[in-house]
Amino acid sequence: MADEQLNEKDLNAEEAGAVDNGARVQELEEQLAAAKDQSLRAVADLQNVRRRAEQDVEKAHKFALEKFAGDLLPVIDSLELALAHSSAEDEQVKKIREGVELTLKMFQDTLKRYNLEAIDPHGQPFNAEHHQAMAMQESAEVEPNSVLNVFQKGYLLNGRLLRPAMVVVSKAPSAPQPSIDEKA
């Protein structure tokens, strides 16, 4: 009988030890899963930081010329104005005009190499993202909300707006006001 009680105690102790070992194994497995999850998150965070840094460097390279290009735009505007206000037939101005044309072409070619493109929207529909309306003018010849005149060209640098085009936008002609005689 004493042996049976000892055997029962040993069995109970072994069962309790097995239960303790099973709980310990489960606890360790949970800790392992948490550690794996934490390491995966750390790797993902590192990849995100690396990707963001690469994107920031790419943007810095892409738009590093933004201020410099913006400072050159008035020079281009001045050259274009000089050509617009000079006569190609005037012999005294002809050589100077040719020089200004060549200088302007060199400027434009250089800017194209750096992905700076002009926006000259004459006759196109008004686009508030790329155009700045300076005035509205009635016109029966073109669709309403079309660009009638361009005061100043706009420019895009790598597809991003550097300067909006300043434009005159058409509007539908208003109906003539009836005269006093017609109202009566």
Curated annotation (Swiss-Prot):
One Gene Ontology molecular-function label: protein homodimerization activity
Gene3D superfamilies recorded: 3.90.20.20, Head domain of nucleotide exchange factor GrpE (2.30.22.10)
Entries under CDD domains matching the protein: GrpE (cd00446)
Region Disordered, annotated ranges: 1-22
GO biological process: protein folding
Basic and acidic residues bias locations: 1-12
Locations listed in the record: Cytoplasm
Pfam families noted in UniProt: GrpE
HAMAP family membership: GrpE (MF_01151)
Xref: NCBIfam families: PRK14139.1, PRK14140.1, PRK14150.1, PRK14151.1
UniProt protein name: Protein GrpE
Protein source organism: Pseudomonas putida (strain W619)
Species classification: Bacteria, Pseudomonadati, Pseudomonadota, Gammaproteobacteria, Pseudomonadales
Recorded name of the encoding gene: grpE
